[in-house]
């Protein structure tokens, strides 16, 4: 996979994002194209009804973004994606029905180089078409801005859960918190399986994704890690050696109930544009764990979490960020590294640190 720079996107959106829409349904091609056209920030420069048409168009002209149907007859979406990443590297947004059966294929696509995915627009999913259109355009713009040379094919092996049983009433005085936004699916798919062993401390993962997608991602990840992972409940008992995920819809704080460490989650309320649920989680971690708090920042597009990172550092905890050049979206990592005493590390280095932190 070679580097490719999207100059049109980097020039402050002076030019519209040249987009290729790929879907075997002419109706869905038209719906997606109309949504992008109406936004004004996109130029739908091509439509393809199958993989061969898509690859032919990519060979003849340059696109800033490709939206790609997961399920297509003949050459399916995953096969097309592999060809795109090898022959015509282009930021790709998978467009999926995201059914129970389809979620695995969708997450497989993220391993093969897709940046993110989006539900196919529908009048039956509980959101207005206008709201779905706005969300699609925002996600498409985020995908078009990625550092494509940071994308990679992830070869994952299935793993048996070998988590050892913990002693009853064991408490913990250390914590690991991970946070990421756009591009963090790929970071997590790389980092957590690389840990290879049960972490010594509890690990809390905050991802800027919807709860529905987070639950499906946790289920998908279970096949590739040798330890317990969960979607955190409203009052989650926290144990060493397990990983707990919270979504962008949640804010978490730590407390002790009858001597047991718990994570209390509630609907997220942003403090302001630059502070959100991750900051509240980090404030709480700094208060309860002090120098035994480890905060890891991964790929992401916004700077929420910086205030929390400062508090962890002030409490003598440790803050590390994924090296910006390895992030699909380096904005968050770069912002963290502007803080004194925050360090940069590769994903394998972060995996080792997280596994051994105590």
Regions found by a protein language model. Give the residues of each.
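Conserved Asp/Asn-Gly motif in the active-site loop of CheY-like receiver
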Residues: 45-52
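Conserved acid/base catalytic micro-environments in cytosolic active-site loops
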Residues: 2-20, 26-37, 52-53, 63, ...
């Amino acid at each position: 996979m070679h580097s490719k720079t999207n100059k049109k996107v980097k020039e402050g959106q002076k030019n519209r994002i040249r987009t290729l829409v790929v879907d075997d349904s002419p109706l869905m091609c038209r719906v997606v194209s109309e949504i992008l056209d109406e936004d004004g920030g996109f130029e739908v420069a091509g439509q393809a009804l199958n993989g061969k048409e898509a690859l032919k168009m990519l060979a003849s002209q340059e696109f800033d973004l490709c939206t790609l149907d997961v399920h297509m007859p003949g050459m399916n979406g995953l096969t097309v994606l592999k060809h795109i990443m090898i022959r015509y590297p282009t930021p790709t947004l998978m467009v999926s029905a995201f059914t129970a059966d389809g979620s695995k294929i969708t997450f497989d696509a993220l391993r093969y180089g897709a940046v993110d995915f989006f539900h196919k627009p529908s009048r039956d999913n509980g959101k207005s078409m206008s709201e779905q259109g706005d969300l699609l355009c925002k996600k498409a713009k985020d995908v078009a801005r990625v550092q494509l040379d940071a994308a990679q094919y992830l070869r994952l092996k299935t793993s048996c859960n070998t988590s050892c049983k913990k002693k009853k009433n064991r408490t913990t005085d250390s914590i690991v918190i991970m946070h990421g936004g756009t591009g963090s699916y790929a970071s997590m798919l790389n980092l957590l399986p690389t840990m290879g062993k049960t972490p010594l401390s509890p690990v809390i993962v905050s991802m800027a994704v919807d709860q529905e997608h987070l639950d499906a991602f946790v289920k998908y990840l279970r096949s590739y890690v040798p330890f317990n992972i969960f979607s955190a409940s409203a009052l989650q008992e926290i144990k060493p050696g397990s990983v707990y995920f919270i979504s962008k819809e949640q804010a978490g704080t730590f407390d002790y109930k009858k001597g047991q460490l718990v994570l209390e989650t509630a609907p997220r309320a942003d403090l302001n544009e630059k502070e959100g649920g991750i900051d509240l989680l980090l404030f709480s971690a700094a208060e309860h764990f002090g120098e035994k708090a480890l905060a890891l920042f991964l790929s992401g597009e916004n700077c929420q979490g910086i205030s929390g990172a400062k508090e962890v550092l002030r409490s003598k905890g440790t803050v590390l960020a994924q090296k910006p050049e390895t992030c699909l979206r380096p904005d968050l990592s770069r912002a963290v590294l502007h803080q004194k005493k925050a360090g940069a590390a590769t994903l394998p280095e972060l995996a080792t640190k997280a596994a051994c932190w105590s």
